[in-house]
Structure formats: structure tokens, C-alpha cells
From Swiss-Prot:
Family the UniProt entry places it in: Belongs to the adenylosuccinate synthetase family.
PANTHER family: ADENYLOSUCCINATE SYNTHETASE
Keywords: Cytoplasm, GTP-binding, Ligase, Magnesium, Metal-binding, Nucleotide-binding, Purine biosynthesis
Cofactor(s) listed in the protein's UniProt record: Mg(2+)
Location of this chain's protein in the cell: Cytoplasm
Residue numbers binding IMP: 23-26, 48-51, 139, 153, 234, 249, 321
Its biological purpose: Plays an important role in the de novo pathway of purine nucleotide biosynthesis. Catalyzes the first committed step in the biosynthesis of AMP from IMP.
The name this protein goes by in its record: Adenylosuccinate synthetase
Residues annotated as binding Mg(2+): 23, 50
Binding, substrate: 317-323
Protein's gene: purA
Length: 448
């Protein structure tokens, strides 16, 4: 269904979150919903997660700038919960402007956003190299170390760039600490103070027109009737608190993070849309109970898993890493629904299951001989989970491009209906292909 064909209520706010380990297809859905939003907000993460959009057959990958930038007239916001690499930001702006997209007149960056500096990247990559086989799977872009500095109260913010003397003083203090770690513990080269200072201050004048009090601006435009769409990155099971720790990202990926990461009150969030693929994927290390295929693990290479990866084109949009694949895990989905307070689900990539003889759904686990119906909290316990499956007859008909529920194959509807039943909440949207209009709408998030 075309998003523009729906009338919605003004002044409503929707949060889009991934319910799995990221890569759920949030970018397409955010793009679809943006037809009814006047602003799109990033509230956590950095340029470590890519959102892939297919618009008019053209593929665009956005890593930092909100997906709404592809819609003329839509304001885009980077909140204080994001960690910002100016280098990555201006590279992305350059790519978009070269394609004719107006960016700098519509992009607003919180003055309180923490900066990613060269020493964060050096530490990130140095640590991962030192871990060897025990690596976490970081993208090496400095996101984690930047969040560490933020929590340790030594982070440098965007607003600090506009006070060069204070910035230089704090940068020198930070480098005294971080260069000791780099040279004495990680055994890599130190980061040069003057070069870093000159590079970072060179961004100040270019950033200044986009920097503002994002929290205040969001409050004002929403009060005036604008609909806001909060765009989560990564997924709930990668959340620093609620994910499969320590195999997680360094920020809170859950819906509640939209309030702290953008500076809005929780009562302003009207609807939480949870995005889930019709199967599961994971990139990098960490437990994965329903796993079928892992290119790096000979014991996890079932043919059906490779088929899901191949048909679903499961390669990271930023890293290019092959994703591990498995059946949809409803017990993990229930955990995500509870944590986020999900209002309704959007099921993506249903078409990847077309042609399978049978489809399985993990509805719980056996853990140390006990039945468990919810994903455990710790990685070691999750690693001991033995999936309990329900099996469904597959469908040979194609679901690609279907825009109405009743036109789905009967077996596909049966599978989706069971997912709703086990999840305990409705499926409000179904994606049947990569193009934005290949979408079934059952209940509109901006109208509920």
C-alpha cells in the first residue's frame, strides 16, 4: 500500500525499534512512515549501523543521517544520545548532496551530542585486535569508546568545538590518558594532539549552522502539530542493558532510549512499532538459539540457513559481513515486546520464506532441562538454550509485492497468525519486498 493514501492524526509520535539483533529492515519502514511525519529523529548509536532504502529502484544506505532526509521538506534531527563522527557526517552529507538531496537546511544536531575522535577509533580497533578469537564483533568505528568517555564525564561534545581553548585543554587531558592506554597496554601508536585538534576544530564552522537545542525544537514543532518519527538503530537484543551482554552494542537500543536520547518526555511517545524479520539474523559474535547457518562455524551450516542468507541478501550494509541466519525466535521476540512496550509489529522479508517446504518458529527453549518461554538475560544462559520449534507447511506461491492481507497464500497467513498469537500483540504491517510500496498495512501507527 502507498503510504500517501492514508489520512493520519496530527501531533502524534511513533518510535520504530528493532526487536532482534538489528538488520530487521527498519530503514524501509521508516521511509514508508515518513510520508506522514514532519520530522525524523535519531536518538542513539553512531555510524556503525546502516539503514538501507530502496526508492524508485535506487539503493541508498544511510549510516548517521535519519532516513527522512530522502523526503523533501522533512526535518531530520540527531539527538544527544547519538555519538557523532564529523568526518562520517560530512562524507554522508557530500554523498547525498552529490545526488541532489538538500541536507544542511533540514538537518539539526543537538549541541549536547558526544563527538567521536581519532583516539576512540584507535582504541576500538586496538582492543578488538588484542581480543583475538574472543572478539565482540565491533565495527571498529569508535562508537563504544566514545560512549565510555561520555559516561566517564570526559567526553567532548559538539558544543565544545565552539570554544577552542576549552576544547584544546580537555583534548590534551584526554590524550594523556588515552595515549597511555594505546601505547602501554594495546601496543599501538599514539594519537597526535595538534593534528587531532586542527582536524576537529576545522569542522566547527561547517557544523555551526546545523547545531541547535534539539530537545526544545522537538517540543515546539510537536506542540504545533508536527508528527515525529523516532528512528532506532541496531536492535533490542543488542541493547547494552537488555541484550545478550557482553555481545552487545554500547548504547540503549530500546524505545525508552528515545526519551533520554532526544530529550522528549515519555508521554510524548504514542505508538511503538517493533520491526521483526520473518526469520532471524545476527552479525558477529554472541549466542543465537535458533541459528541455522554461520559461515565461520562448520557445525552451523544447514542448507536452509544458507538459502535464507542467499535469498535474503544477508550481508551487513556497513560492514559487508555475512549475517548468521536462523528461524524466527518468538521467545526472544516476546522479551523485546515486553522491554519496549511494543504497540504492534511489522513483519519484514516475508517473501524470503517463499518456496520453502516447511517453516519453523521457535516458541521457547529447554535450558538445563527446564522449559523456558522467554529469552534469558545473560549470554552464557542464552548459549545453553535448546530451541523448541513449531513446524508449519510452507507456501510455493510468491508473496513479493502483495499489498493486501487476504491475497497472501493461506499458509503464509497461518504462519503470521501464529506469530501474532505467540507474541501477544498484532502484526500491523507486513513487508513483502524491498520497495517502499511493497507493504501490507493493517493498522497505521500514526492513526492508532
Amino acid at each position: 500500500m502507498s503510504a500517501s493514501a492514508v489520512n493520519v492524526n496530527p501531533g502524534r509520535n511513533v518510535v520504530v525499534v528493532g526487536t532482534q539483533w538489528g538488520d530487521e529492515g527498519k530503514g524501509k519502514i521508516v521511509d514508508w512512515l515518513t510520508d506522514h511525519a514532519q520530522g525524523v529523529v535519531r536518538f542513539q548509536g553512531g555510524h556503525n549501523a546502516g539503514h538501507t532504502l530502496i526508492i524508485g529502484g535506487k539503493k541508498t544506505i544511510l549510516r548517521l543521517i535519519p532516513s527522512g532526509i530522502m523526503h523533501p521538506g522533512v526535518a531530520c534531527y540527531i539527538g544527544n544520545g547519538v555519538v557523532l563522527s564529523p568526518e562520517a557526517l560530512f562524507k554522508e552529507i557530500g554523498e547525498l548532496e552529490a545526488a541532489g538531496v538538500d541536507v544542511q537546511n533540514r538537518l539539526f544536531i543537538s549541541e549536547a551530542t558526544t563527538l567521536i575522535l581519532p583516539y576512540h577509533i584507535a582504541i576500538d580497533q586496538g582492543r578488538e585486535a588484542r581480543r583475538g578469537a574472543g572478539k565482540i564483533g565491533t565495527t571498529g568505528r569508535g562508537i563504544g569508546p566514545a560512549y565510555e568517555d561520555k559516561v566517564a564525564r570526559r567526553g567532548l561534545r559538539v558544543q565544545d568545538l565552539f570554544e577552542p581553548e576549552i576544547f584544546a585543554e580537555r583534548l590534551r587531558e584526554n590524550l594523556d590518558y588515552h595515549n597511555f592506554v594505546l601505547t602501554q597496554y594495546l601496543g599501538v601508536a599514539a594519537v597526535d594532539f595538534q593534528q587531532t585538534l586542527d582536524t576537529m576544530l576545522s569542522y566547527a564552522d561547517r557544523l555551526r549552522p546545523m547545531v541547535t537545542d534539539v530537545s526544545r525544537r522537538l517540543y515546539d514543532v510537536n506542540a504545533a502539530g508536527s508528527n515525529l518519527l523516532f528512528e532506532g538503530a541496531q536492535g533490542t537484543l543488542l541493547d547494552i542493558d537488555h541484550g545478550t551482554y557482553p555481545f552487545v552494542t554500547s548504547s540503549n537500543c530500546v524505545a525508552g532510549a528515545a526519551t533520554a536520547g532526544a530529550g522528549v518526555g515519555p508521554q510524548k511517545l504514542n505508538y511503538i512499532l517493533g520491526i521483526t524479520k520473518a526469520y532471524c539474523t545476527r552479525v558477529g559474535s554472541g549466542p543465537f538459539p535458533s541459528e541455522l547457518y554461520d559461515a565461520d562455524n562448520a557445525a552451523r551450516q544447514e542448507a536452509i540457513g544458507l538459502e535464507l542468507a542467499t535469498v535474503g541478501k544477508e550481508f551487513g550494509s556497513v560492514t559487508g559481513r555475512p549475517r548468521r541466519t536462523g528461524w524466527l525466535d518468538a521467545a526472544a521476540l516476546r522479551r523485546s515486546i515486553q522491554i519496549n512496550g511494543v504497540s504492534g509489529l511489522c513483519m519484514t522479508k516475508l517473501d524470503v520464506l517463499d518456496g520453502l517446504d516447511e517453516v519453523k518458529l521457535c516458541v521457547g527453549y529447554k535450558v538445563d532441562g527446564k522449559n523456558v518461554d522467554l529469552l534469558p538475560r545473560g549470554a552464557s544462559e542464552v548459549a545453553r538454550c535448546e530451541p523448541v520449534y513449531e513446524t508449519f507447511a510452507g507456501w510455493k506461491e510468491s508473496t513479493v509485492g502483495i499489498k493486501e492481507w487476504d491475497k497472501l497464500p493461506a499458509n503464509a497467513r497461518a504462519y503470521l497468525s501464529r506469530v501474532q498469537e505467540v507474541a501477544g500483540i498484532p502484526i500491523d504491517m507486513v513487508s513483502t519486498g524491498p520497495d517502499r510500496d511493497e507493504t501490507i498495512l493493517l493498522r497505521h501507527p500514526f492513526k492508532v
